[in-house]
Swiss-Prot record:
It comes from the Bacteria. Gene3D superfamilies: Alkaline Phosphatase, subunit A, BPG-independent phosphoglycerate mutase, domain B. GO terms for cellular component: cytosol. It comes from Phocaeicola vulgatus (strain ATCC 8482 / DSM 1447 / JCM 5826 / CCUG 4940 / NBRC 14291 / NCTC 11154). Pfam families: iPGM_N, Metalloenzyme. Belongs to the BPG-independent phosphoglycerate mutase family. Catalyzes the interconversion of 2-phosphoglycerate and 3-phosphoglycerate. Its EC number is 5.4.2.12. The keyword Metal-binding applies. This is 2,3-bisphosphoglycerate-independent phosphoglycerate mutase.
C-alpha cells in the first residue's frame, strides 16, 4: 500500500554517548523522546568507508546528502585513487598507460607536480610514491618532481621531513626532486597571477634560489623565518628538470580548486602581460577533472556520474517532489541530493528560506528553522507532493560554534519543529523517515572540557513514523535511505541503487 513520503534530515544530529558532551541527550526533547518510544528506529553509519570516505574520516554534509540521494555508496576521489594504487589497477588505467608509454617511446621527460604533504586535503603522498614506482617500472630515466610545500593542512615546518621521505623513496624507486616552492605561489585560487608567475618561472625556466641539496635548502628557508606555505622558489641546480615542449606532466592534486590556475597558464591561456605562455605539445594529465572548460588535458580519474538518484528516478516515474531548506543547507538538499545536478527535475519544486544574517549562529540558535517548518507544513497540507525532503540545519551549524548553551537552544527548536512537521505529515497521509547526515551536536565537548566544533564519528538515527504497528527497521548506512523511501512510495528499486530497504 503506497503512501506519500517525507524525509527529514536533522543536520548534525548524531547518536552520542549520553555523556556530558552529548547536548542532544542532555537537552529536554519531549517530542523526539516520544518518537523513539512509539515508532521503530535504528542506526545508520555516516562516516568513513560507509559513505565512500577513507576509514575513520568523519562524514560531512556534502558527502552525506550525496549518499542519501544516490541510494548507493558514492566513493570520493581520494578513496577511488587509493584503491587503484592499493590493488595496482592504476597500472591498467588507460591514461596512465598513455602518459608513461608516450614518455618512454618519445624519449621525453616526465614531471610530477603537486602538494607534497600528508595533509590529505588536496593530494596524497602515497599517490606520488606510486607514480615514482610506475616510472621505475617503465624505466623512464628523466623523472622530475616539483614539490609544492604545504604548511596549511600540515604543520608549518613539516615540509623538510616530507622532502627527506620523498628523497629516500626516490633512491629506491625513480625520480629526482627538480624544484620546491610554497603553495602560496603554486596553488593560488584568487587570480593573483603575480604569485603564480613565481611558480611558473621556476617550473619552466628554473628561476629561483639555486641549490644542490634540497633538504638543506628547506632548512635555510626556515632559518630565514620562511615556512612551508611561503617557501620561495628553489631550483635543483644538479639537474635540468624544467618543463619543455612535448614533455609529460602529471599534476597529482585530486582537489581541483587550487590546481586550476597553474594548469591554465601551462596549458590553456597565454598571459603575455604576465610573461606566461602555454607550452607547445605538452602532454598534461590532471588527477581529476579540474575544470569542464579545459581543452586538451587528460584526466586520470574522471568523476563518477551518479545516474538514477532518488530525485531523477521519481521524476522519470511522474512523481512530484519538494526540496526545502534554509540557505546554509539548500545546496545539500538540491545539488548534492540530486547527485551533483544544479537544475531541478520535472515536477520538482524547491523552497529556499534565507538563513539569518548574523556573524555566528550562536547569536540566533533557532536560525530559520521555524520559517522552514511553517513553509513545509503549508506544502504538506496541499498534498500535492509525493515526496518531500527537508533539512533542518541547526544541529550542525550551531554545533560548529562549540557554544554549549546555544546548541541546547538549537536542539529545543528542532524538537518543536519536528513535532509540528510530523503531526502535519501524519494528518495528510505521509509516512516520515527522520535521519541525520552526520553527527555534531551529539559531541560538543572534548575530553578536557574544551569546545568541540567538529563533526562526530557517531552513527545517526533512522526513525520510521508509520501507522503500521508491525513495521520493523534494520541498521544500515546513509545509502539505504533512498531504497527505504521507495518502499513507502510502493516503487521498485532501480538496479543503480545498491543500498538496501531497511523497512521490514
Amino acid at each position: 500500500m503506497s503512501k506519500k513520503a517525507l524525509l527529514m534530515i536533522l543536520d548534525g544530529w548524531g547518536i552520542g554517548d549520553q555523556g556530558k558532551d552529548d547536548v542532544i541527550f542532555n537537552t529536554p526533547t519531549p517530542y523526539w523522546d516520544s518518537l523513539l518510544a512509539n515508532y521503530p528506529h535504528s542506526e545508520l553509519q555516516a562516516s568513513g568507508e560507509n559513505v565512500g570516505l577513507p576509514d575513520g574520516q568523519m562524514g560531512n554534509s556534502e558527502v552525506g546528502h550525496l549518499n542519501i540521494g544516490a541510494g548507493r555508496i558514492v566513493y570520493q576521489d581520494l578513496v577511488k585513487i587509493n584503491r587503484a594504487c592499493a590493488d595496482n589497477s592504476i597500472m591498467k588505467n588507460p591514461e596512465i598507460v598513455s602518459a608513461f608509454s608516450y614518455a618512454k617511446e618519445n624519449g621525453k621527460n616526465i614531471h610530477f607536480m603537486g602538494l607534497t604533504s600528508n595533509g590529505g586535503v588536496h593530494s596524497s603522498f602515497d599517490h606520488l610514491f606510486k607514480l615514482c614506482d610506475i616510472s621505475k617500472e617503465y624505466g623512464i630515466e628523466n623523472t622530475f618532481i616539483h614539490c609544492f610545500m604545504d604548511g596549511r593542512d600540515t604543520d608549518p615546518k613539516s615540509g623538510k621531513g616530507f622532502i627527506e621521505q620523498l628523497t629516500a623513496h626516490c633512491e629506491k624507486s625513480a625520480g629526482k626532486i627538480a624544484s620546491i616552492v610554497g603553495r602560496f605561489y603554486a596553488m593560488d585560487r584568487d587570480k593573483r597571477w603575480e604569485r603564480v608567475k613565481e611558480a611558473y618561472d621556476l617550473l619552466v625556466e628554473g628561476k629561483g634560489k639555486q641549490a644542490t641539496d634540497m633538504v638543506q635548502a628547506m632548512q635555510e628557508s626556515y632559518d630565514e623565518g620562511v615556512t612551508d606555505e611561503f617557501i620561495k622558489p628553489i631550483n635543483n641546480s644538479t639537474v635540468d628538470g624544467t618543463i619543455k615542449e612535448g614533455d609529460v606532466v602529471i599534476f597529482f592534486n585530486y582537489r581541483n580548486d587550487r590546481a586550476k590556475e597553474l594548469t591554465v597558464v601551462l596549458t590553456q591561456q597565454d598571459m603575455p602581460e604576465q610573461g606566461m605562455h602555454t607550452i607547445p605539445g605538452l602532454q598534461f594529465y590532471c588527477m581529476t577533472p579540474y575544470d569542464a572548460s579545459f581543452k586538451g588535458v587528460h584526466i586520470l580519474f574522471d568523476k563518477e556520474n551518479v545516474q538514477n538518484t532518488l530525485g531523477e528516478y521519481l521524476a522519470a516515474n511522474g512523481k512530484t517532489q519538494l526540496h526545502i531548506a534554509e540557505t546554509e543547507k539548500y545546496a545539500h538538499v538540491t545539488f548534492f541530493f540530486n547527485g551533483g545536478r544544479e537544475t531541478p527535475y520535472d515536477a520538482e519544486e524547491r523552497i529556499l528560506v534565507p538563513s539569518p544574517k548574523v556573524a555566528t549562529y550562536d547569536l540566533k540558535p533557532e536560525m530559520s528553522a521555524y520559517e522552514v517548518k511553517d513553509k513545509l507544513v503549508e506544502a504538506i497540507k496541499t498534498q500535492k507532493f509525493d515526496f518531500i525532503v527537508v533539512n533542518y540545519a541547526n544541529g550542525d551549524m550551531v554545533g560548529h560554534t562549540g557554544i554549549y548553551d546555544a546548541i541546547e537552544k538549537a536542539v529545543k527548536a528542532i524538537d518543536e519543529c519536528v513535532k509540528d512537521t510530523v503531526e502535519a505529515a501524519k494528518a495528510n497521509d505521509y509516512e516520515v523517515i527522520i535521519i541525520a547526515d552526520h553527527g555534531n551536536a551529539d559531541h560538543a565537548l572534548n575530553e578536557d572540557g574544551t569546545p568541540n566544533t567538529a563533526h562526530s564519528l557517531n552513527p545517526v538515527p533512522f526513525v520510521y513514523v508509520t501507522e503500521n504497528k508491525n513495521a520493523k527497521v534494520e541498521n544500515g548506512v546513509l545509502a539505504d535511505v533512498a531504497p527505504s523511501i521507495l518502499h513507502i512510495l510502493g516503487m521498485p528499486q532501480p538496479a543503480d541503487m545498491t543500498g538496501r530497504d531497511l523497512i521490514k
